Amino acid sequence: MSVDAFSRESDDMMSLLDYDFIEGSSSDENAEVTEMETSAKTANNKNEVLFAPPCTQELLTERPSPDSKNSQGDDDSNSIYGNVIRDAQHSASRYATRCLDNAIPRKRLRLANLTVDSACISQTKRPHGTGNRKQYHRRNFPMSPTSQEKIHLRLHNRLGSRSEKQQRSLNYDRRLQEGHHRRRFYSERRIYDQNHSHHRTHDIRVPLEKYRVSRQHDLPVHEELNEILQREKHRLASISNECDFRVSSKNRWAAVLTFSSNAESTLCGPQITWEYLLHAGPELRNTFEIRPRISLQASAAREAVLRGESFIAALGSAEETLSWLKLHAVLKLRLVNHDPIFKTAGAVLDNLRLKLAPIMMCKYGTEKRSMGDMLRRSAPEDINDSLTLCLILLSRIRRVMHRTSGSKYSYMIDPRGCMIDYVPGECMTNILRYVDAHTRRCSDPACNLYISCTLMPIYIHGRYFYCNTLFGM
C-alpha cells in the first residue's frame, strides 16, 4: 500500500467522528433513513442528527454547525471532546427512554435538549479555576429561561433591583453606617442614647421641670392663686347668668331651675310627696326636653355636686333618680336623652360604691361575689333586696343612657316592673337599716368607726399636717 493511500485512509478514519447523516427526504416513525449523503461537507451535521432525539426541524436548524463562523475550536478540539458529546447524547437518550409511557413527549424532548446543549456549552467555554463547584454548575448548566426569569422576578419583587448573591436586609447598610452593629461601653452608650431619642433608655428620675408650668405673670404665688380663684368665680357667675331655662314665674320648678354661684344655696331641693311629683313631674320633663343645650350644662354642674356628696346625701340622690324612673314607668313616658337626672345616674352610683365598698367587703369578704362583678353584669335576676335594687337599676340607667341610641323607655331599664310597686324612700331606709345591722354584728372596731364617720361626716381625726411653702392659708 502506498503512502498516499495510507494517509488518505487515516484521514477518512479521523474524520468519521465529524460525519453527519442528513436525510434527503422524509423519514417514517422508526426514523429510518431513505436517502443519505456522505459528502465531506455534510459530515459534521450527520453525526448530530444520528444521535439527537426526535424533535422538530425548526430546532435542528437553529443549532450552529462547526463549519459556521460562530463555531469555536478547531478539528483537534472537536476530536478531543467528541467522546464527551457522545456520552452526553447517549445518557440523554437513555434518560428519555426510561420515562413513563404516559409522560408528555415534549418533556422528554426538553430534558434531552438541555443535556446536549449543556455539554456543548461546556465544550466551547470552560472556566479556569474561578468560583466553587456550585457556581461552576450554575454557570455551565443554567436553568431553563422561563424558570430563571421567574426567579429573577420573584427576587426583584421582594428585594428590589439588588442582584447580589446574598440578599441582605434593606436597612443593613444604614445600620452599618450608624454603627448599630458595634458593642459600646457604658459611657459611650450613654452619650449615644442622649443623641438618639428612639434608643434612649428609661430614666426613673424625671426632672421636676417637666411638670412645672411656665408662669405668665411675675406675681407672688399667693396673688397668682387668688387671681386664678377669682377668675373661676367670675366665670361661674357669668355661666349662672347665661344658663337659664327661661321659665316663667308661674312654673312650680322655677326655684330649682335657676343657676346660682352661691355656695350656701340648698342642694337637696324642696321636699315633696309622690302625689305632687306625679302631678308636676311632666312639666319638669318638658322643660328638659325643650331646652337641650341648657340641660347638658345642668348635667355637668349636677355631676360635680353629686360626686362630692356625703353618704346620706348620696342616698337622697339615688332616691331622686329612682323616683324619677318610677314617674316615667307609671305615666309611660319616653326618656329624654339629655335629661340631667338620668344623665348623672353614673355619678350617684360611683359615689355609693365608694362609700359602701369597705362595708360590703367586711361583711361578705370572699364568700360572695364582689360588687364590681355584680354591677358588671347588672342582671335583673340579681335583685334580691333594696341594696341590690338601687345599685343595679342605677347601673342599668347609666348603660342605657350612654350606649343605647334611639327612643328609650323605662321597661328597657326595669324589665321586671319593680318600679310600679316601688315606694319612694324605700331604698334609703332599707340601706341605712342594712348598715346599722352590720354595725351591731361586726366586731371590728375599725369598721365601726368608719361607719360612724360615714353616716355623720364630722371631722374627728385623719389629717396630720398641711405642707405648703408657697403661700399661707
Curated annotation (Swiss-Prot):
GO biological process: regulation of DNA-templated transcription
Subcellular location: Host cytoplasm; Host nucleus
InterPro entries: ICP27-like
Sites where the protein binds Zn(2+): 362, 438, 442, 447
Any GO molecular function: zinc ion binding
Keywords on record: Early protein, Host cytoplasm, Host nucleus, Host-virus interaction, Metal-binding, RNA-binding, Zinc, Zinc-finger
Zn finger spans (CHC2-type): 362-447
Region listing for Disordered, in residue ranges: 57-81, 123-143
GO terms under cellular component: host cell cytoplasm; host cell nucleus
Pfam families: Herpes_UL69
Tree of life domain: Viruses
General function of this protein: Multifunctional regulator of the expression of viral genes that mediates nuclear export of viral intronless mRNAs. This immediate early (EI) protein promotes the nuclear export of viral intronless mRNAs by interacting with mRNAs and host NXF1/TAP.
Record's subunit section: Associates in a complex with RNA, and host export factors NXF1/TAP and ALYREF; these interactions allow nuclear export of viral transcripts.
Similarity annotation: Belongs to the HHV-1 ICP27 protein family.
Name of the protein this chain belongs to: mRNA export factor ICP27 homolog
Organism annotation: Gallid herpesvirus 2 (strain Chicken/Md5/ATCC VR-987)
